[in-house]
Amino acid sequence: MKKVFLSALAIAAMASCSKTELSNTPDGSVEIKAKSTALSISTKSPYEGTISSGNPLTAQVLVSKTDGNYTSRYCDGEMTFSDDGTTEASFATPQYYPADGSVLYLCGLYPSDLGGWGTVTESASRTFDGKTDIMAAAQQQSSKSEAQAGTYPTMQFKHLLTKLVVKLVAEDDAAVTAWGNVTDISLVGVNGSQKPYSKVEVTLQDGTAVTGSAFSTTVESFSFYTMTENTYNDVAFSAQTFALTKTAANAAYSLVAPITATGSGDFKLKITTQKNADSPLVNEVAVDLKNTSNSTFTGDTQGKAFEITLTFKATEIQAKASVKEWEKAGTATGEIK
């Protein structure tokens, strides 16, 4: 299935809510609504740009009567936000504030399928696969009286992963001939010898997942997925036939666990090429991150996107990396010789 940045399809699902609470709701009750903003965020592929009617964001909204704890929820369900912090969104089946006027606490998770978040308590955990954006919105509080006055909570969704985009280019015709097609790209290392993580735990009260401590479950190899200049696909970059040219072109992307970068050996990519019926050539390429001024990038990569340009030379592969939106942070380059 091909996905272009963000699907315009807004999926609404039935929200669950306590029948006891609803039975106490009098006529003229006030509906629970919320607004949303997103920091340059995509749906299952990376969410890009600003929330709008043509670029909606469907998220899971959890509602609790207990500050910071969503084990026992007042309501939960999907809300589809269609603009950036202006228009309120509702649950598919309207839900209402408690008749006693007590305060409610709301937080947001993306993707919107609650089942994928495991057992929800003060936190929620999810395994990610490289093609799915993970976002969270910190807890907000709201009450019936505030809603009656026209004040609704605004949920700000933030990226919790790091986006890597790989561009491929051959230095010259000799390199094209020497390497053949690129067949496989994967992430096999981070911060030198460490393996990449594949699971995140989000603290719901503040909507955070601290780089390092909130990530777990290492894997030997983490997938990249095919893409073009403007389209993200959910097809793994495995057994592909990507033809090298002398013009750099987007080839693959992955949404990976963030790291604390040092600017040396930040990521390690495994690149496989094959020329005709020859045996495949496998290379591991270290990627050193650079910032937007082409100096060494150090620090947290969460919420940032890096563009990695792999240059194939007749004798080696070289890598460079640079940052692009989501949040501009830097670049990386590499050569394959």
What are these regions (language model features)?
Residues K2-A8, M14-K337:
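Sec-type signal peptide cleavage vicinity
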